[in-house]
Amino acid sequence: MAQKEGGRTVPCCSRPKVAALTAGTLLLLTAIGAASWAIVAVLLRSDQEPLYPVQVSSADARLMVFDKTEGTWRLLCSSRSNARVAGLSCVEMGFLRALTHSELDVRTAGANGTSGFFCVDEGRLPHTQRLLEVISVCDCPRGRFLATICQDCGRRKLPVDRIVGGRDTSLGRWPWQVSLRYDGAHLCGGSLLSGDWVLTAAHCFPERNRVLSRWRVFAGAVAQASPHGLQLAVQAVVYHGGYLPFRDPNSEENSNDIALVHLSSPLPLTEYIQPVCLPAAGQALVDGKICTVTGWGNTQYYGQQAGVLQEARVPIISNDVCNGADFYGNQIKPKMFCAGYPEGGIDACQGDSGGPFVCEDSISRTPRWRLCGIVSWGTGCALAQKPGVYTKVSDFREWIFQAIKTHSEASGMVTQL
């Protein structure tokens, strides 16, 4: 993940060969099957996990919104803005986009546990990122309501066993993980947001690595030498214009370490290739929560790359602790976070950069994996009181959606503030 050179902590890609996870106890969460609803809400359930009040039924794709005042779920009255409302709702829940939308009639489809309707203020709709800000209770005389299907994400398509100990991960366990290769060598990790967009770290693309024809994205395999993985060319790289080391090579500021890779053509989604979810709007990190980081990086600080994808479970550390004098001494900025163990021993390392830090949650009734962090930097690998540092993805939701919207036809290296 990072090197310490001349007293300065720098991203792992400052060296030509980089790759996955520090050796140590490796664990895997069990896969969870599909359930009836995709839910995100600001309610509290028995596990005290914050939820956001928007649901999409897997039965008939009806969109439902929770009425906090009445304690009931309401349908969303159909309008001329159905396409925009569907897109906004899916994005708010952490999906990349709405795939389709339609109208249903409550007289034929039934209320199915809902009570009444919300209507959208279409005049205010273009100026908000949150559905709750532009809806109010209404009668909806026609009784027609909105249904939508969001791009699926954050779910495995194969049953997987629980792994305890230091074994390699298995095919289909982390289907959003990709390898970014330059001249055929693994350089960084990345996470699929869709068939043609990958989220990774900006520092993977210094000046010396900007010939896009030499980049390939490798997906659908856990072994670097696998003949069964798919390799696709890169059309464009969109990096954050606020990543200071690209403007000043002497800068030690690692904020805004985020980039999007647009593939030349979409990857086919299979059991081994699937997108990960983004955090829902307003979803906060939970200090102490144990999540998973994956990659092909070095298994020791001065070790070799891992030939097979590795995984490690590490807890999120509060920024107050990580900014302490014994840790990183105020180097952790608001759009970063730390994860690891104070005693060290399990961490991301060189070559994991840009790869996923994912957390499973139940903010939808179908548990999903969300991309909460991007492997960014650190001091050494698995050192005591020097945990891995990650880009906080929740703080870049708007940047991600705007970059995809703006640069879908771009080619080459592109910057986006």
Swiss-Prot record:
It is a single-pass type II membrane protein. Residues 163-405 form the Peptidase S1 domain. It is found in: Membrane. InterPro entries: Hepsin-SRCR_dom, Peptidase_S1_PA, Peptidase_S1_PA_chymotrypsin, Peptidase_S1A, SRCR-like_dom_sf, Trypsin_dom, TRYPSIN_HIS, TRYPSIN_SER. One of its GO terms (biological process) is response to thyroid hormone. Residues 1-23 are cytoplasmic. One of its GO terms (cellular component) is cell surface. The chain crosses the membrane at residues 24-44. Disulfide bonds join 77-140, 90-150, 119-138, 153-277, 188-204, 291-359, 322-338, 349-381. SMART domains: Tryp_SPc. Residues 45-417 are extracellular. Plays an essential role in cell growth and maintenance of cell morphology. May mediate the activating cleavage of HGF and MST1/HGFL. Plays a role in the proteolytic processing of ACE2. Belongs to the peptidase S1 family. PANTHER family: ACROSIN-RELATED, HYALIN. This is Serine protease hepsin. It comes from Pongo abelii (Sumatran orangutan). The gene is HPN.
